[in-house]
Regions:
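Active-site core of metal-dependent hydrolases
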Residues: 155-260, 267-268, 273, 278-281, ...
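Histidine/acidic-residue-rich, glycine-tolerant segments that coordinate divalent metal ions
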Residues: 86-194, 198, 202, 209
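Hydrophobic faces of well-ordered beta-strands that scaffold small-molecule active sites
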Residues: 45-51, 82-84, 103-107, 145-147, ...
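His/Asp/Glu-enriched, well-ordered alpha-helical/loop segment
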Residues: 177, 255-335
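Metal-associated gating/positioning segment near the N- to mid-region
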Residues: 41-98, 114-121, 198
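Acidic/histidine-rich helix-loop elements
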Residues: 53-64, 113-124, 154-161, 236, ...
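N-terminal metal-binding scaffold of metallo-dependent hydrolase/deaminase domains
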Residues: 1-31, 37, 41-43, 334-340, ...
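C-terminal cap of metal-dependent C-N hydrolases
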Residues: 308-311, 323-366
Length: 366
């Protein structure tokens, strides 16, 4: 398939011609190419760096058809690269479909008994087994492992760490020996120091970050995926936790200061990327909402786009719009740098050189 696009290519902001042959961007014009767009704004494929293909909205496991439908929704929203931050089902069969987003898997959540959502993760009775389980998930994943760093401990009625510092050190070392990076679900404050001491590569949510842990993350290049649209569910979680008033108050407080927390991390230089936490309480296809939410935390539109597109792609080892790269990009009628809401309405999605959601070609720049 030979395709031609012309438009303002981001992030450079230059009007260029893009040529696609056999799913790959080329640096030279292609004769007899099918011109798809003669104007518009062209953005490297968006990234949902924290989602869960295979978890039903509202809870439970998806079947194969449901997992396909979730991936299709992500694609149509322009999210062409997904980091699946823990799924209870094997979604490798999706890799056989060239019309679905590329997925980077982190295996299954690793937690303790009664310290995470039932039936979603692997439950470790004895934390001395954690390094071996982490190594196994590293081999099954695509270069990532997902730990549950904290969760409510009903015996104390509030968030608390799941693992000792020694167990974390051994587990993260085991993952690194397998060539995998490690990320961890963390809502509160107390689990963060041990994870950072152990060399964790990424923190999910991070609502409990303090000035000290932010400084440490920035110094070590530890990434943050704040999942702001998921954090907005915290008040509802608190409302349903009347048996645990300290936990409920804690969750409300974490939500109240969440935008400020992310803003301080951004100002300190912590690498921040977009993730929706789709699957479970958040529906798939909301990457535009998460990018917009970053502007509520002090991001400029340019930096919010970077966190949800080209910088996130580079962090995950995928290329942007350049010769020799896979043709994974999105075309918009309006400039997303001046109106991020346009991200919710792509004119054309191109994945592996195939066109999806094509509307009438844009013929003017605005």
């Amino acid at each position: 398939m030979r395709l031609h696009f012309r438009g303002v290519v981001l992030p450079e902001g230059e009007v260029r011609d893009l040529w696609v042959r056999d799913g790959v961007l080329t640096g030279e014009p292609i004769r007899e190419a099918d011109t798809i767009a003669t104007a518009g704004w062209i953005l490297p494929g968006l990234v949902d760096a924290h989602c869960h293909v295979g978890i039903k909205h509202g809870g439970g496991h998806e079947d194969r058809a449901g997992a396909v439908a979730q991936a299709e929704v992500e694609r149509d929203a322009g999210a062409l690269l997904l980091r699946d931050a823990g799924s209870p089902i094997d979604t490798r069969f999706l890799d056989d479909r060239d019309d679905l987003p590329r997925i980077i898997r982190a295996g299954r959540h690793i937690a303790r008994p009664k310290r995470y959502i039932r039936e979603l993760g692997i439950e470790v009775d004895d934390e001395r087994e954690l390094p071996d389980i982490v190594a196994e998930q590293a081999r099954r994943g695509d270069g990532w492992v997902k730990l549950v760093g904290d969760w409510i401990d009903r015996s104390i009625g509030d968030l608390a760490p799941l693992w000792s510092d020694a167990a974390l050190q051994a587990a993260i070392d085991a993952a690194h020996r397998e060539g995998a990076r490690v990320t961890a679900h963390v809502f509160g404050e107390d689990a963060l120091p041990g994870l950072l001491d152990a060399g964790i590569d990424c923190i999910e949510h991070g609502t409990g970050l303090t000035d000290d842990t932010i400084t440490r993350m920035a110094a070590h290049g530890t990434a943050l995926v704040p999942t702001l649209i998921n954090i907005d569910t915290f008040p509802g979680i608190a409302d349903g936790a009347s048996k645990f008033p300290a936990y409920a108050a804690h969750m409300r407080d974490l939500h109240r200061r969440s935008r400020d927390t992310v803003a301080r991390a951004h100002e300190a230089g912590v690498p921040i990327y977009t993730g929706t936490d789709a699957g479970g309480s958040i529906r798939h296809g909301r990457i535009a909402d998460e990018i917009i939410a970053l502007t509520e935390a002090g991001f400029s539109p340019h930096h919010a786009l970077a966190a949800g597109s080209w910088q996130a792609r580079g962090w995950l080892g995928h290329r942007g719009i350049e010769p020799g790269a896979p043709a994974d990009f999105v075309v918009y009628d309006e400039d997303p740098r001046t109106n991020l809401a346009t991200l919710s309405n792509p004119a054309c999605v191109v994945l592996r050189g195939r066109v999806h959601l094509r509307r009438s070609p844009v013929t003017v720049h605005r």
